[in-house]
């Protein structure tokens, strides 16, 4: 018997894109916390992550697998961010990433809040989302 897939809720929202914020994180800054702080400092309630790159001390991801939520620890230092996308909303941000370790092994999942600290630098591009 095939296990039942989790029920998901999809929300469709109309709106438009607003201001663009491009920022460089300093060492030891968490990606999610920093993205939320950047938005707050510019009066942005919701933003789309247009991109991100840089390196993390360690990578901490999660994904929903066959047996519920699974964690992935990517030991560093020097974990490279190859892809970063998602949405930034104060306290509810959801960022998906593809990371590579020093051997080039790839890992994908959702960043865990407070556990993905910039190593040397991380660059983020965020764009304001203005719902109708």
Question: Regions from the language model: what does each represent?
Answer:
Residues 1-51, 56-94, 98-132:
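N-terminal intrinsically disordered, cationic/polar leader segments
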């Amino acid at each position: 018997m095939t296990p039942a897939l989790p029920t998901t809720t999809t929300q469709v929202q109309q709106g438009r894109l607003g201001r663009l914020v491009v920022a460089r994180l300093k060492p030891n800054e968490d990606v999610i916390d920093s993205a939320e702080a950047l938005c707050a400092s510019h009066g942005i309630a919701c933003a789309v992550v247009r991109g991100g790159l840089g390196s993390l001390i360690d990578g901490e991801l999660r994904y929903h697998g066959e047996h519920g939520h699974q964690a992935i620890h990517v030991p560093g230092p020097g974990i490279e961010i190859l892809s970063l996308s998602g949405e930034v909303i104060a306290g509810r941000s959801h960022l998906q990433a593809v990371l590579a370790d020093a051997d080039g092994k790839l890992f994908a999942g959702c960043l865990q809040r407070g556990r993905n600290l910039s190593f040397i630098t991380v660059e983020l591009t965020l764009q304001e989302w203005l719902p109708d």
